[in-house]
Amino acid sequence: KECMADGTVCYIHNHNDCCGSCLCPNGPLARPWEMLVGNCKCGPKA
């Protein structure tokens, strides 16, 4: 299965599809909400 390139918006349902990690700006507590609203993007593996 293809993985999503860095810079692609990642959501709860597909954050594991990033080639690297799904990176969210405001840390772990806000993460579920940020994924919901589309604030997270695929980036290099953490």
Curated annotation (Swiss-Prot):
Subcellular location: Secreted
Cysteines engaged in disulfide bonds, as pairs: C3-C19, C10-C22, C18-C42, C24-C40
Region: Keys region for toxin activity, residue numbers: 31-33
UniProt key word Isomerase: no
One Gene Ontology MF term: toxin activity
Chief location bin: secreted
A GO CC term attached to the entry: extracellular region
Keywords from the UniProt entry: Disulfide bond, Knottin, Secreted, Toxin
Top-level division of the source organism's lineage: Eukaryota
Tissue expression per record: Expressed by the venom gland.
Free-text domain note: The presence of a 'disulfide through disulfide knot' structurally defines this protein as a knottin.
Protein family per UniProt: Belongs to the neurotoxin 16 (SFI) family.
Function, in words: Insecticidal toxin. It inhibits insect voltage-gated sodium channels (Nav) by partially blocking the channel pore in DUM neurons from the American cockroach, not by acting as a gating modifier. The inhibition is only partially reversible after prolonged washout. In vivo, the toxin causes flaccid paralysis followed by death when injected into Heliothis virescens larvae. It also causes uncoordinated movements followed by full paralysis to sheep blowflies (Lucilia cuprina).
Name used for this protein in its record: Mu-segestritoxin-Sf1h
Source organism (scientific name): Segestria florentina
Lineage, broadest ranks: Eukaryota, Metazoa, Ecdysozoa, Arthropoda, Chelicerata
